[in-house]
């Protein structure tokens, strides 16, 4: 996904600025063992180009921890890269051996205890970054498509797929309204319909 392609995407008015770019690891050595055909620098450039071309873009990803041979240093590199990119949301999962894959034959499989510990560390970082992203939405005015009632609220999603809750006596379901984001709580933004 080069800069020219991203600029062309940005001209599509109906395109929502939410991009899921699977990272797997933020360490080049680990990516190479995974047989991924990209490096962190290339990935970072794509993210920068998306953020330069799309206002308030949401970048989400998948991260695997405990891949065969992942050293403490490699895990730390992955943590540092993920902090640098500042994802809106991260799906974290531990590596598990898959029969028939080349990784099954790798030496230096990571113990379940280390995988569990690294998963907890990565999940803590993911929660922190998600909270920071949601907080960055406060005071913004966003178009929200309302999808379902939740208790006294109606839940919808902004163009960048941020969950937003509002109170309203009107039937907002299936409709798009401008909403001013006013606060964040429990992984949701709260707002007022304008």
Residue ranges with predicted function:
Residues 105-194:
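Terminal RNA-binding accessory module
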Residues 87, 92, 123-127:
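Short N-terminal helix-initiation segments at or just after the protein's N-terminus
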Residues 1-89, 95-114:
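Conserved non-cysteine loop/helix-boundary elements of the Radical SAM core domain that shape
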């Amino acid at each position: 996904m080069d800069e020219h392609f991203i600029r062309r995407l940005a001209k599509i008015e109906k395109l929502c600025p939410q991009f899921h770019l699977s990272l797997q690891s933020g360490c080049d050595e680990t990516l190479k063992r995974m047989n991924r055909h990209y490096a962190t620098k290339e990935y970072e450039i794509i993210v920068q180009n998306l953020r330069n071309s799309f206002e308030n873009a949401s970048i989400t990803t998948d991260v695997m921890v405990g891949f065969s041979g992942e050293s403490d240093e490699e895990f730390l590199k992955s943590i540092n890269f993920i902090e640098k990119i500042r994802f809106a949301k991260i799906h974290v999962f531990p590596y598990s051996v898959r029969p028939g894959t080349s990784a099954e034959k790798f030496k230096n499989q990571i113990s379940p205890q280390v995988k569990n510990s690294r998963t907890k560390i990565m999940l803590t970082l993911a929660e922190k970054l998600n909270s920071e992203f949601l907080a960055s939405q406060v005071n913004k005015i966003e178009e929200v498509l309302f999808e379902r009632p939740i208790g006294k609220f109606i839940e919808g999603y902004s163009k960048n797929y941020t969950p937003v809750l509002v109170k309203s006596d009107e039937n907002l379901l299936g409709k798009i309204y401008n909403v001013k984001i006013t606060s964040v709580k429990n992984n949701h933004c709260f707002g007022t319909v304008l």
